[in-house]
Amino acid sequence: MNYLNENIDSLNKKLQDGEITAEDLAKETVKNIKETDKKINAWITVDDDAKPAENLDFAKNKLAGIPIAIKDNIITNGMKTTAASHILCNYMPVYDATVISKLKKAQATFVGKTNMDEFAMGSSTEHSYYGATRNPWDLEKVPGGSSGGSAAAVASGEVVAALGSDTGGSIRQPAAFNGIFGIKPTYGRVSRWGLIAFGSSLDQIGVMSKRVKDSAEVLNVIAGPDEHDATVSEKEVPDFTSFLGQDVKGLRVAVPKEYMDAVDGEMRDAIQKQIDVLKDAGAVINEVSLPHTKYVVPTYYIVASSEASSNLQRYDGIRYGYRAKDTKNLLDVYVKSRSEGFGDEVKRRIMLGSFALSAGAYDEFFKKAAQVRTLICRDFEKIFEENDVIVGPTTTEPAFGIGEEISDPIKMYNNDILTISANLAGIPAASVPAGLVDGMPAGLQIMAKRFDEGTVFKVADFIERNNKFYEKTPTGMED
């Protein structure tokens, strides 16, 4: 079964009406993945024997029997979880991440784990031990990263929704490149327990889907307190679907000058068109400045790489994961296991982070980056004193070609320039389709105050209802 023209509501109705059984839905989903994925390589693991939960309550649980894709850095009990790395290629977890436990309680069906950049470090899903994922709109283009597998699986109609993780744009950039919706909630809105750590002060699990409402339905389930994660907020979780279908009259919309100056030509026109839609509907558009935008890339890569170098110390060839053969002593085990188990990009970030944290460089690099991060947060706080939401482009350009930027790390890192700030500030941010640029999707980024995902959904839904981009079929999937 292909989901290009389906959503959670339509599938829920078919299940309630008996038009299809949950068992058949799972089987058809796996069958379609096997066929479609020959083109795009969106999956690392597919569960051939995927089965729905028992005693499904379709009326109570919107997600009951609905197949959901899971990014392969989210722990799943009894299902291989690799983070797209050689070092974890045979890792079989014995527990579920909190988000998985919550989805199981909601009776969702799990069909497999999606491809990604190794340990979520990348912007193209080319840095994977399991090969690159291709963009369903153009099979010679990247799907973005690091949640490129989840994005491609949704865009190609393999599933209606998928979980991803976002450390510097890893949900929003792939969402933009693939013409789907993707949301990174506020830091602390969703438990990170069971998410394989990259940058612990930046990581956040989120949702990707073709329709805005589908992400709202999934976020309703996975958000909220968790005794296993001390960083999760105790704030009450609203019904995010209640923010849909509203108008935007009187909404104060900030448009950062620095973001619009980063794009030109068709990309700028596509973004401006969506801003004009909001203006014509009665929103108040205000040009603003985020003066520290020029520092976000170096700040992020120092902070994220430093946290990564610490988090990845646990992969040593001893406790679990890949262990090198023909080693002479304990040091040899450490060195060879990590050298052979990690890919080039992961090793690059570990080295960068280790240097930034070293005694001679700490004050000049990590401490300075932490101080600049505070200034970036203050920029956003100031804007939100007089505005309800910030909008602008998600990326500076549409999807680039496979192999085009992989040998140029600096160029690859700059792909994140418009998305990183939301992670540094811990605010909710999403990307919603804004049209086509050179035949490839472009995304409008929407950001709001901490724990105000509702306004993000409100604006995204308004844009979606206006342009109906979800009706388009990815050109790479056309027969």
UniProtKB/Swiss-Prot annotation:
Keyword ATP-binding applies: yes
Pfam family, one: Amidase
Tagged with keyword Nucleotide-binding: yes
Active site per UniProt: K71, S146, S170
GO BP, one annotated term: translation
GO cellular component terms, A-Z: glutamyl-tRNA(Gln) amidotransferase complex
GO molecular function, one term: glutaminyl-tRNA synthase (glutamine-hydrolyzing) activity
Catalytic activity as recorded in UniProt: L-glutamyl-tRNA(Gln) + L-glutamine + ATP + H2O = L-glutaminyl-tRNA(Gln) + L-glutamate + ADP + phosphate + H(+)
EC number: 6.3.5.7
Keyword terms: ATP-binding, Ligase, Nucleotide-binding, Protein biosynthesis
InterPro entries in alphabetical order: Amidase, Amidase_CS, Amidase_dom, AS_sf, GatA
PANTHER family (UniProt xref): GLUTAMYL-TRNA(GLN) AMIDOTRANSFERASE SUBUNIT A (PTHR11895:SF151), TRANSAMIDASE (PTHR11895)
Family note: Belongs to the amidase family. GatA subfamily.
NCBIfam families referenced in this protein's UniProt entry, alphabetically: gatA
Subunit structure: Heterotrimer of A, B and C subunits.
Function: Allows the formation of correctly charged Gln-tRNA(Gln) through the transamidation of misacylated Glu-tRNA(Gln) in organisms which lack glutaminyl-tRNA synthetase. The reaction takes place in the presence of glutamine and ATP through an activated gamma-phospho-Glu-tRNA(Gln).
Protein name stated in the entry: Glutamyl-tRNA(Gln) amidotransferase subunit A
Source organism: Lactobacillus gasseri (strain ATCC 33323 / DSM 20243 / BCRC 14619 / CIP 102991 / JCM 1131 / KCTC 3163 / NCIMB 11718 / NCTC 13722 / AM63)
